[in-house]
């Protein structure tokens, strides 16, 4: 038996007007609101205005921390207000949302998400990333998908532009990773549906990405910003839920194996998830020998200011042996779809992508 649930979503600058009705669908009268400090400052006024005059009680507003670690997850789990709430409203980027989603597993709570940045698809997914206290990857948790997503393009447009930029970088991976992971064929219905939807993920980025980034840099809520936010949160989020099931995993591949391995390499500087993943996409195309898409995506990375070389993410070719070693521990490497990954091919792909990037 397989049951597939997908998040409802409301998009628009007036999206919070739908919040009381969405809560009523679940009989919810008590909520706790958890998120990043900046995210709460952006989202709370709209949430509170929408709930004013209703029978919904806000039991707590909590800053979750700064990363989705076990310690921060435990703080949510141990909060009396979160234990009492009918619904947890998670506000912020991927790390804030993943913290709340993971805590909700133990608390057995419904989660609504408010992505105040669109740096990844966490607002829609039934998967969450958990990090160690030192920032290295611990692994994944598998919560229920959020029940409802509230996407406010104005909040996203007024957030720091680097998160929008990195979100485009992360979303660039969805279509090629799923296409490669499923390329052996013989897909059952749900995975096939995920692949069909994956085919819709890249073109909106090429169409609206440059304009959207320009608009976000001017704090301008525009059609381009909305289209990119929908693509990152909804398109790629739905694909994630359809391509990640108990009996198969096609949700990520070489690009995320590369990113996850980099998390264990000590180096100066900080690099956003999607920033590094976008370079991993070039590694993926080098790995598969897809020169046409390597050139296309690399040109787009260059146009967007996303990385095209190892040096741009604080790495060098001397790190490649360690990247191969750390990649072995990643879920992507263990799944090995459509066929087992090899150190030799992975190392050669990193070198080839880096060499091509240096020509741009």
Regions found by a protein language model. Give the residues of each.
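Short glycine/serine/threonine-rich phosphate/pyrophosphate-binding segments
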Residues: 16, 40-44, 70, 95-102, ...
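A short, small-residue-rich loop immediately preceding and capping a beta-strand
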Residues: 80-103, 107-116
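ATP/NTP phosphate-donor binding region
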Residues: 1-84, 310
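A glycine/threonine-rich phosphate-anchoring loop and its flanking beta-alpha core
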Residues: 105-198
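Active-site segments that bind and position negatively charged phosphate/pyrophosphate groups
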Residues: 188-299
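C-terminal charged capping/lid subdomain of soluble metabolic enzymes
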Residues: 2, 18, 290-360
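Generic secondary-structure signature for well-ordered alpha-helical cores
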Residues: 24, 52, 56, 135, ...
